[in-house]
Amino acid sequence: MIIHGNSANMHQIRNEEADFVITSPPYLSDLSYLDWKKPLKKQTEIDRVEKDVVNFALKLKPVFKEIRRILKSGGALVIQTKDLRYGGFIIPLVDLHCDLVRQLGFRLVGRTAWLPKTVRPKLRTKKDAYNISSGFRTLDTEIFLTLTTPEGLKGEKSAKELEKELEKGDDLKVEDIVKPLWITGLGRHGKSNHPDASPIPPVKRFIALFSKKDELVVDPFAGGGTNLWAAKQMNRRFVGYEINRNYVLEAKKLLKIK
């Protein structure tokens, strides 16, 4: 099910009831989002924008406290996040999210970068083809942080089980799961119902890795329900929370629930 409400209070879920939590928190306030969408030449207030990004991230702390409450001992929390590029500079949001959840008792066990197969370098050089220094930038990856409780990961799944569950839509081999960079397609059919919908292949990999059939998967920032849809396709029970009513309606359409 998906619940229209603030995930700082997930009272519908008991203590340590969730087997796995996978989510992507919002990155920007409405004000910073408008700044971020400006043309590059007009992105001139990085100090103010970075301060707002930090303050906005810290406001999500009550949600992460609730995640700590509902996640079973030894369960996994996967957070999709990314560093933000503004005015040619990088705001290190990944480290901010990681530090925030670690302060609440989680322990970091993995960091996976993801790129879509269709990515192309967008290095805008000056007319002098040899002068690329001032226009240097690296490709921007999505980062999936894997964390767990202080007891350490307690999941039990064999390599054979993992490959069997993924074989229908993913050519992943177990030895690839530990690689620091995953490159896949988006895995979507048609237009996404949310501007920041997660890529489906890595989401399915994490669901397969850290949960089993009929176990409970929770997404506290459900958006248009992409993660919940993936969980449903993989025969998991699922609960999502979304504060925006319009996206709740979109998610219900995707999940085919009333």
Name every feature range the model reports, one short phrase each:
Residues 1-250:
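Core catalytic lobe of class I
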